[in-house]
Amino acid sequence: GYTFNEDGNLLLDDLANNTTTLDLSGTQISTDALAELSMFPNLTDVDLSDNGYGPAFDFAKLPEQITGIDLTGNEIYDYDNLVSVVVEENGDETVTNLHEITKLYLPETAKENIEDLVRFYRQNKEAITAGTIDMKMTDVDGNLQTYTTLRDVPDANLLTYLQTNFADLFNGDQIDLSKHLGLDQKTKELLVAPADNVTNFEGIQFLVENPYWEGAKISLYSAGEESIASMPNIKVGKFITQVILQNIEVEDIDLSNATDLRSAWVQNNPALQKLDLSYSTIWGQGDKETEGNGTYGSSLMVLGCPILKEIKLPEKNELKAYRIDIECLDALETFDMSNVKMVAELSIGDLNKDFNLVYPELTIFYSEDGYAGTYFACSENTFYRESTQAFLKANYTDIDPDDTVRRLGYTSSLSYDKNKGCRWRTLLNKQK
């Protein structure tokens, strides 16, 4: 019913001037086009539900006059430019609203967000309680409910573990996202062992992604190898140096903030398609003495992930690592190790037969025991790959006898019980 002139500009007739609310639900309007809503001089409320937005929504795209917004039905996890946060050295926070809000209706995925929404809620709690700000969130059934910072942990064993080790986060049997961790729990490592018998890790994200948790290690194991546990997607924080996930089905492990990550071990994950370590400013970037040490050196183990397509390392000209172990990756398409110049232990099991296996271009051969720079193991299928033959020729068959440290050390052992290492030294001798 709106009228536009020949240049496509809105004519400010009575209809346009009197428009205070606008339903744009299901229109798939891009967020870049939202700035054009400022042409309605009295528009304050807009329905943007079911528009396919996500994983982030940027409030800076909204005209300042829009104070009421419905984002339900979208898959949004991050709410950029809703608030700004300044954290003092003592941990105190100064939160500032970046966009005036009188109504905020959120999708069910908003329950995952702590960084933006919980701080907005805490900053504006008095207005929300008084009804000056109408803040709601849909539940799993799509029904709007009053927004709350309380979150459930469905698995009773996980609940027990978290209440025992991170009690400061809880309000009764629910995690309260508005609570802070005390000093003793703030840096505590997260270790859920097989003996803890967890089969559903729903709720763990509220600790892993909590900005007030500064633990360095995440080690999560399901109840057993035959019991694959479920887990929601997680975004790992900047304090994390080690991630271990075994027998857990999770679609996405976001490591974009994990700049201190040094070690990753993912085993038996039927859902993961990508593992990206490229954000780390630590992995593979220490000196040879550090990286050649089994305790402090960089490590990557990816075993039994049947639909994993891509692994990425930091994009540096020279990487050094203690361990790289990839086995039973039936769908692997992309993993370039050519910038790895030193690795103490290299294990290559069965991989996608069409995968172009690019080996490390080794130039540094350091060993704490003074014997071999790189201990190498592979499966028989991998042994017969052309690139493996070339790697062995360059680093084992044609070595300089005057080398003080042998380039390749022999081992036939692989880590993954569903893969068998071959006696590659014997197979080489048979080829002579």
Predicted feature descriptions by range:
Residues T20-L24, T44-L48, T67-L71, T102-L106, ...:
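Conserved hydrophobic beta-strand positions in leucine-rich repeat
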Residues S222-N269, Y279:
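Right-handed parallel beta-helix
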